[in-house]
Structures are given as C-alpha cells and as structure tokens.
A protein has these predicted regions:
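Charged, low-complexity intrinsically disordered terminal segments
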Residues: 2-436
Length: 436
C-alpha cells in the first residue's frame, strides 16, 4: 500500500515567527559583512610638499618623533637573509633562553619549520623558562594542528590565538595581527615579515624556497618590541608583563637610532604617514621592496612627484613566482601611473620575494611587516622598524642592489601590451584590493 505524506500546515503565528527569524538572520548577515569589510582605521589624505630632506633635522622631528615611544639610540640591528640566515639564529636564541621567551607570528605551519620552533619552545618550558606564544587566528589557526598546540600547553607554554576565526566577535574577524616578534629574556629581539613554514627555509635556491629578511635587535629597542608583544598579549590573554625578567635595564649595544612603529585598531595609521613624509623628503633615491604592492592614489602621487624632483624611484616586486596572483593583479592597476610618471619597476625572478622594506637617500629605512597596500594601512595590526642611520641605510641599499641583479624591469610598453584577460582581472580585483 502506498504511503501518503501528511501535509503540515503552518499556522499564522509560526509563519510570523519564521519571517522574523529570516529578517533577523538577514540583519545579522548585513552587520557581519559591514564589520568584516568596512570597519577599518581612518586614513588621512596626505598633501605634502618637499620642504626638507631626510638628512635634515626637520625630517627627524616630522617622521620619527610623531609617535610614542620616540626613537631610541644605542641599538644594534643585523639583517638576516633567507631561512638559512634567520631560522638558526632565532632557534639558537630560544634554546639559550634563561628566563622568558615571547613569540608572536602571523603564519606558523605544522611542518618541519613549525615543529622545530614548537620543540625548541617546549624544551625551554620544561626547563622552567616562561614561554608565551601568540599566533594570529587566521594566519596560523588553519595551518597549525591542535595537537601541536596541546603539546606546548601540556608542558606549561602559555598559548593564545589573536582574534580567533570561530568567534562571535565578527567585528574582529577581518582585523589580523600581522606582527612578527620574538623576544628572549627581554634582551634580544627579532622582527620582520617572515612566516614559520618550509617555504621560508633554505637560501632562496628555487621556487619552493622564498627570499625574505628578518632583523635581529639588541639594545633599548628590544623593550619596544616587548611592549608591542605585550599590547596584543593583554588583549588576548589578559596578562601583563612586568619585572626585570621581561623588561631588564638595557644599555647601548650599538649606535643605531630607531623606533618600533605599531599600528592599532581604529587609531591613526602611522606607517603610511611615515612613508608619505619620507617620500616627500627624498632628494636622491627611494628604493622599495614589497611583496604585496598595491599603492594608493596618494602614494602614487607622492612617488611621481619625487621623480619630478629627479629622485630615483624603484620598486622590486614579485615576478613569475607569486603566492597571491589576485593581489598582483590588483597592484598592477597602479603600474600605469607609476611607469608613466618615471617610476621604475623590477620583478624578482628566482622565487617569491617576501621582503617588506624601503630605504630613502641611504639614510632612512623602514623595515618590518607592512605591505604597501590598503590592508596594512587600514586594517591589519603591523610592526615596523623606522631606522635613522646611514650605515644601516648603506646595508639596505646593498641588499636592494643584490636583489636587483636577479630582477627584470617591467616596462611601460609591457604594461600597455598586457593581455585582455590581465586587464579584466585587474578591473575585477581593484574594488577588493583592501581585502587582498
């Protein structure tokens, strides 16, 4: 006998409830989209003229003394290139820790590199060292196994994700911590833009091993790196850092004058302002290496005006090896104005170049986690070092020139001859460039 289905007739009350539930869900969806895509820092449109150079005292007062803390003298900053340079140095620092290790990263994978750092942190925690690990909920949350987190926590490591993805706080979902910080015993620090995964290992020997740079810091500047870590640790874990084990008295370790510039949620974006002042002050050279380069209209204007003052403006950006092709398409939309304005663009050929650095007139350097893009300017929480030192600037220029030897110039004619599909992709990606 065939079975007959019973028709369920909803009453008026049930229909009204369902309608209100649907309206409520739609409203929550709109709120979520607004929070994710439209909440960002206020960014000022800069209208700057060339009135002083980076060698003049006015530049130091305008660019470096805008923020708290002010620049500190007496620092030593080493540039460590590629995984063979920075990973052994960072692991050695962790393994030599006596009191405290504070480690913050955007990307940590469960792979050979991630496990090496996991094991080093676990070994120190077992030895009685206070170990704190703070990873971004997006950059690492999908890539680090829960078993690795559990292993660290079981031996006493304090662990937290910054802005976890699976959270009711949708207003935080799009605001990522892009900072990279390692501070050991409050005396030695590392920062830059690297990730802790196998593609950052090696010596950029092939397309599977990226080219990147990390800084090793000694001197009073280390306390600023510690402060930057503590800011996010308090927000995430609810614990302050104090005492001589975290903030020892730091004497001079070198002669470099520098400061750590951090961006915060809903505050003025300090890095774009510093970049803008440096662009306006340049008299000889602006050399920029940037992994994800989608400059704003204001930044393009300042760079083109610098060329008009006979400043040599050059970019090194990723070439055929790029892990974010859509970001590359969004960035290329700005190439036309840059190239027509006399800016030179070079594409790095051997592998993905992940460096985020600039040097102006061999005197002022900016180095760290920030890309030259709207996301770093308006959304992410970044950490960069602003360095006012000619000897360090000379090293930055030497690094740029070395990378330039492995790069090919991208010309205005190439830009004009790009394919129909390249143009379509650029047009489609441009509205989303702040999210890429």
């Amino acid at each position: 006998m065939a079975q007959t289905r019973k028709k369920v007739k909803l009453g008026r009350l049930e229909l009204e409830v369902m309608e209100w539930v649907a309206i409520g869900l739609a409203f929550l969806g709109i709120v979520a989209v607004f929070c994710i895509f439209f909440i960002r820092r206020h960014v000022i449109e800069y209208h700057l003229d060339h009135t002083f150079g980076v060698n003049d005292p006015e530049f130091f007062g305008s660019a470096l003394a805008l923020y708290d803390p002010v620049p500190l003298t007496g620092n030593k900053i080493e540039l460590l290139q590629d995984g063979d340079g920075y990973f052994p140095a960072m692991l050695a620092a962790i393994r030599g820790a006596k009191k405290t290790v504070n480690f913050q990263a955007y990307i940590v994978y469960s792979d050979k590199i991630g496990w090496a750092f996991r094991d080093a942190l676990i070994e120190r925690a077992r030895a009685g060292v206070e170990v704190r690990v703070l990873l971004d909920g997006l950059g690492s949350g999908w890539n680090l196994n829960n078993s690795d987190v559990k292993m660290m926590e079981e031996v006493g490591c304090k662990f937290a994700y910054y802005h976890p993805i699976l959270s009711w706080r949708v207003d935080r979902t799009n605001r990522r911590s892009h900072r990279r910080i390692l501070v050991v015993d409050g005396r030695v620090g590392f920062t830059g833009g690297i990730g802790f995964a196998e593609q950052w290992s090696g010596h950029a020997q092939d397309a599977n091993h990226w080219h990147d740079v990390q800084a090793r810091v000694e001197g009073p500047l280390v306390s600023e790196l510690q402060n930057a870590f503590e800011e996010h640790w308090i927000k995430t874990f609810g614990e302050t850092l104090s005492g001589a084990d975290q903030f020892p008295a730091l004497g001079p370790a070198g002669e470099i004058r520098a400061q750590a510039i951090t961006s915060h949620s809903f505050s003025m974006a300090p890095v774009p302002l510093t970049q803008a002042i440096a662009f306006a002050a340049a008299e000889k050279r602006i050399w920029i290496t940037n992994a994800y380069c989608t400059p704003t209209d204001d930044q393009v204007d300042l760079l083109v005006r610098a060329v008009q003052r006979q400043v040599d403006v050059r970019f090194i950006v990723p070439g055929p090896h790029n892990d974010q092709p859509l970001t590359k398409s969004a960035g290329r939309a700005a190439y036309g104005r840059l190239l027509e304005g006399g800016v030179k663009i070079f594409e790095y050929q051997p592998t993905m170049i992940h460096t985020k650095a600039m040097v102006v007139d061999g005197m002022f350097s900016l180095f760290g986690s920030s890309n030259l893009d709207p996301r770093s300017s308006e959304i992410n929480e970044e950490l960069d070092l602003a360095i006012y030192d000619r000897e360090f600037g000379t090293r930055m220029e030497a690094m740029f020139e070395s990378d330039l030897k492995h790069s090919t110039e991208y010309t205005l004619q190439q830009f004009k001859n790009r394919s129909f599909w390249e143009r379509v992709t650029e047009a489609l990606m441009l509205p989303f460039r702040s999210q890429l």
